C-alpha cells in the first residue's frame, strides 16, 4: 500500500515540496534564508492579525489605539514589538537571501529570480505602508515625503499623488487605504512565495559550486528540515532578544510624538532597511533623477542575468568577482549609514561617491571582472 503522504492529493503536494524533495547534498547555511523568510512571513501575518483586532485606522484615534495596545491589551506590547522588529528580521533575511542569489549565480533561474524581485518590491511596499499606520511624526512625514516623489513623474505626477492621498494632503483617507493595503498585501506575498517555490522546484536548487547536482541529491527531510529548525531557533533568539531587551533600538524616537502636519521633524528618514535606497535618492540633486535612481537601485536586480558574463555560474572559484562582491556589500553598508545622516558636508559627497560606486560595481566592474576571469581560465 502506498504511503498516504504520497497518494493523498493535498499531502502529495506538501510531500513533494518539503519531505521527499531531492536537494543538493552540499548546500550551505546560506540556503537557510528561504525557510526563514517563510517563518518571518507567518510571524508577521499572525502578530499583524492580532494588532488589527485592536487598531483603528482613523487619524484621530490611530496613535492612541497603538498606545492602548501597548498599555491595556494582554501582551499587546510584545505583539506590537514582535511585529515591528519582525519586519527588521524579515529584511535582514531578505538581504541575505538576495546576496546569496547574487554570489552563487542563482539568478540564472529566470522565473524564480524575477518572481523574487517582484516579492522584494511587494515586501518593501508593505513595510512602508505599515510604518505609516502608528501615525507618529515619522509615519506622517515619511508618508508625505515618499508619496510626494511620484509628483516627479512628468505630466501625470501631481494628479497621481493626489489620487493616492485621496485628497490634497496625507490625511484620513490615506491612512485608511494604507491600512487596507497593508492588511491584504501579506496574503498576496504568501501567494507569490508559493509561485516562487513552484518555479524553484521546476529546476531544483542551485548549490555553492554552481554546477549541476543531479547525480548527488538527498531527501529534504530529515537533513534540511533539521538544518532549517536550527536557523529558525536562531532567528527567534535574535528576534526575542531585540523585542525583550531593546525593542526601540531600530525605531525612531520621533514616532512616539503624534503626527502633526504643522511641525516638520528636523531629519526625515525611513526605517533602517530603506536607508541605502534613500541615500541614493538624496545623492542626486534633481528630483526626477533621484526617483529614477531610487527605483533602479532595486530594479537593477532584474538585469543581473543579462549582466552575467562569466563562464562559471557561482563566484566560488572567482576571486576577483568575490572581491568586488564584498566591496559592493561594504558600499551598501556605507549607503545605509549615509541615509541616516543629515544632508551636510561631508555626508553629501560620501553619499554621492557611494551611489556612483554602487551602479559602477554592478553595471561595469563585475561584468568586466568576469570577462578577465574567463581569459584567465585559458592560462
From Swiss-Prot:
It comes from the Eukaryota. Its cofactor is heme b. Its main location: mitochondrion. SUPFAM superfamilies: a domain/subunit of cytochrome bc1 complex (Ubiquinol-cytochrome c reductase), Transmembrane di-heme cytochromes. Keywords: Electron transport, Heme, Iron, Membrane, Metal-binding, Mitochondrion, Mitochondrion inner membrane, Respiratory chain, Transmembrane, Transmembrane helix, Transport, Ubiquinone. It is a multi-pass membrane protein. A ubiquinone binds at residue 201. GO terms for molecular function: metal ion binding; ubiquinol-cytochrome-c reductase activity. It is found in: Mitochondrion inner membrane. GO terms for cellular component: mitochondrial inner membrane; respiratory chain complex III. The chain crosses the membrane at residues 33-53, 77-98, 113-133, 178-198, 226-246, 288-308, 320-340, 347-367. Heme b b562 binds at residues 83, 182. The keyword Signal does not apply. Binds 2 heme b groups non-covalently. Coiled coil: none annotated. Heme b b566 binds at residues 97, 196. GO terms for biological process: mitochondrial electron transport, ubiquinol to cytochrome c. Belongs to the cytochrome b family. Heme 1 (or BL or b562) is low-potential and absorbs at about 562 nm, and heme 2 (or BH or b566) is high-potential and absorbs at about 566 nm. Component of the ubiquinol-cytochrome c reductase complex (complex III or cytochrome b-c1 complex) that is part of the mitochondrial respiratory chain. The b-c1 complex mediates electron transfer from ubiquinol to cytochrome c. Contributes to the generation of a proton gradient across the mitochondrial membrane that is then used for ATP synthesis. This is Cytochrome b. It comes from Moschus leucogaster. The lineage of its organism: Eukaryota, Metazoa, Chordata, Craniata, Vertebrata.
Amino acid at each position: 500500500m502506498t504511503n498516504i503522504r504520497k497518494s493523498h492529493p493535498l499531502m502529495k503536494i506538501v510531500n513533494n515540496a518539503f519531505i521527499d524533495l531531492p536537494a543538493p547534498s552540499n548546500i550551505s547555511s546560506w540556503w537557510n534564508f528561504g525557510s526563514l523568510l517563510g517563518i518571518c512571513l507567518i510571524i508577521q501575518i499572525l502578530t499583524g492579525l492580532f494588532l488589527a483586532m485592536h487598531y483603528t485606522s482613523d487619524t484621530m484615534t490611530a496613535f492612541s489605539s497603538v498606545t492602548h495596545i501597548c498599555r491595556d491589551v494582554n501582551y499587546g506590547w510584545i505583539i506590537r514589538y514582535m511585529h515591528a522588529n519582525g519586519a527588521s528580521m524579515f529584511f535582514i533575511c531578505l538581504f541575505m537571501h538576495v546576496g546569496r542569489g547574487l554570489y552563487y549565480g542563482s539568478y540564472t533561474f529566470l522565473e524564480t529570480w524575477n518572481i523574487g524581485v517582484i516579492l522584494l518590491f511587494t515586501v518593501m511596499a508593505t513595510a512602508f505602508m505599515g510604518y505609516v499606520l502608528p501615525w507618529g511624526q515619522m509615519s506622517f512625514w515619511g508618508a508625505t515625503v515618499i508619496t510626494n516623489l511620484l509628483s516627479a513623474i512628468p505630466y501625470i505626477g501631481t494628479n497621481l499623488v493626489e489620487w493616492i492621498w485621496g485628497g490634497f494632503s496625507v490625511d484620513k483617507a490615506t491612512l485608511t487605504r494604507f491600512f487596507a493595503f497593508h492588511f491584504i498585501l501579506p496574503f498576496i506575498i504568501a501567494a507569490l512565495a508559493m509561485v516562487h517555490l513552484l518555479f524553484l522546484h521546476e529546476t531544483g536548487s542551485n548549490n555553492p559550486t554552481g554546477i549541476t547536482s543531479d547525480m548527488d541529491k538527498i531527501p529534504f527531510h530529515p537533513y534540511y528540515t533539521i538544518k532549517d529548525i536550527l536557523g529558525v531557533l536562531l532567528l527567534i533568539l535574535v528576534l526575542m532578544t531585540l523585542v525583550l531587551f531593546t525593542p526601540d533600538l531600530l525605531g525612531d524616537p520621533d514616532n512616539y510624538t503624534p503626527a502633526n502636519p504643522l511641525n516638520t521633524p528636523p531629519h526625515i528618514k525611513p526605517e533602517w532597511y530603506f536607508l541605502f535606497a534613500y541615500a541614493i535618492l538624496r545623492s542626486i540633486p534633481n528630483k526626477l533623477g533621484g526617483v529614477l535612481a531610487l527605483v533602479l537601485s532595486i530594479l537593477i536586480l532584474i538585469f543581473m542575468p543579462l549582466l552575467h558574463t562569466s563562464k562559471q555560474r557561482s563566484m566560488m572559484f572567482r576571486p576577483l568577482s568575490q572581491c568586488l562582491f564584498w566591496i559592493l556589500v561594504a558600499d551598501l553598508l556605507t549607503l545605509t549609514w549615509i541615509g541616516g545622516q543629515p544632508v551636510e558636508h561631508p555626508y553629501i559627497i560620501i553619499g554621492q561617491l557611494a551611489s556612483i560606486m554602487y551602479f559602477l560595481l554592478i553595471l561595469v566592474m563585475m561584468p568586466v571582472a568576469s570577462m578577465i576571469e574567463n581569459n584567465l581560465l585559458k592560462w
